[in-house]
Amino acid sequence: MGAAALPAVVVTFALDLVVLGGVWLALRPGRADIRSKDDLDRLRHGGRPVVVELYSNFCLICMSNRQTSKLAAMTLRGTAKVVRLELPTKAGSAIGDAYGARYTPSYLVFDEHGDLVRSVVPDNVTPLANGYRVLDGQGAIVSRAQRITPALLVSLVRGAG
């Protein structure tokens, strides 16, 4: 590599980092709707079903599922709430542990009475390869899903999951 090629490599690398940073900023999940157990309890006892997406701002799958949650929220508008909880926070970890959701992305589905009726959790830390387990309120597997879709989230709220 000649002396002239080194600056070109550095510039190309710098541009790649800028583009990658821009993509990450555009796709990252952003702020949580739930920041405490009290926030979750208020939503759970609000008389409507609630879907809680547990995510991490550094989880690439969470970033790609962001639109999935938005589409489910649009479909369920007026009948259920779709909210987000950042798992790697103090409140997120406590809530995740209480409901057996330790990896992102995971989803908790509460009915209109505030009871956990379904949860969707990765089979392990690599859900892209292994998919997700759909669990009932007691933690028993009721089905599996290869990926999270708006239709899956909507069906879980409507009781078809």
Which stretches of residues belong to each language-model region?
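Typically the conserved alpha-helix immediately C-terminal to a functionally engaged Cys/Sec
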Residues: L40, M63-L76
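The canonical Cys-X-X-Cys-His
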Residues: C59-M63, Y107
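Non-catalytic, surface beta->alpha helical segment in thiol-disulfide oxidoreductase systems
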Residues: Y103, L108-G161
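Thiol-based oxidoreductase modules, predominantly thioredoxin-like and allied folds used
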Residues: L54, R77-S93
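Short active-site neighborhood of thiol/selenol oxidoreductases, capturing the structured segment around
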Residues: H45-F58
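A short glycine-leucine-enriched loop at secondary-structure breakpoints
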Residues: D97-A101
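N-terminal targeting signals for export/organelle localization
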Residues: M1-I34
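Juxtamembrane extracytosolic/periplasmic "stalk" immediately C-terminal to the first targeting helix
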Residues: R35-R44
